[in-house]
Amino acid sequence: MQKKIFLLAIICATVFFLPHYACAETQWFWLDSNDKYSKYFEPDSVTIKKKVVTSDGKEIAIEIEAWTKTTYSYEGASETIKNYGITNILPDPKNLAYSLALLRVNPQNRTLQYVREDFYNAAHQVVWSKEEGRVKEINSRSFDEEFYCAIVDEVFRMGERDRKRAPREERWLDLWTYTDDAGNTINLTADTTTMRLKGTNLILWEWQTKKDSRGQTVEIRFMKKSVNLTQGTEVIKDGQIWTSTNSWQELKDDYDGAYRMIHSDDPDYKGLVRLRAYVKNNSNWVSRYSLD
């Protein structure tokens, strides 16, 4: 009898310590696919790890975790192996079939972290693992945007995925278009999915395109900004720049991180007016998940 109890205890312990993703009952929800990748997440795995109580008594999640799955074509596997710098471990992309990842999300700062990643071959054997990846902010150029939106929507139901997948004219807000003396046309748009209001500062990502007189794109700026809507000032917090002669490079802020005044004769002033109007008309959206 004691032997049976001991064996039962071993079995229970084994089941208890099985990784979450090893469970046969895992139901993966499809998010998106292209020629390289297919992305899934498991709604039942979404867990609120931390939350705070605001001054008005609301409980707001500030840390959420969930499991995701990515499957790879040959091209996707090759790209992933190169990006992770593991060619010495996986020289043949055919040996990478899919990966499972535990993601940690902070909705207030729109950030995501890979807590754990396990990479598998077609025989469901782990070929490489990685833990505690860097924390990164999610924007329109992020590979993980679908994951972020699905996980946050599972908790808050604010329509992150719908806005992410909306037509361009619904997701992107045109701020201004300007033609300079050389005949270059510059257009600036704001990604409404990234907008969040912190006090009087609107945090957002903007996409600026410059085309020459022939209509050829010669420069693209992708910028994270903080715009003080009350004072009429702004600062570039992060960004990248692309030119027709160089690939993407880090965008350096000419003001060394200081806020600059937006003057009434600047093209950006028209953008400031549009941002103020957008915030006024979409207060629930820009204040979603806010702790203020």
Model-flagged regions — what are they?
Residues M1-A9:
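Bacterial N-terminal signal peptides that target proteins for export
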Residues I10-I11, G232:
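Enrichment for repetitive, rod-forming helical segments
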Residues T14-A22:
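C-terminal segment of classical bacterial N-terminal signal peptides
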Residues C23-D292:
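N-terminal secretory-pathway/extracellular module detecting exported/lumenal segments
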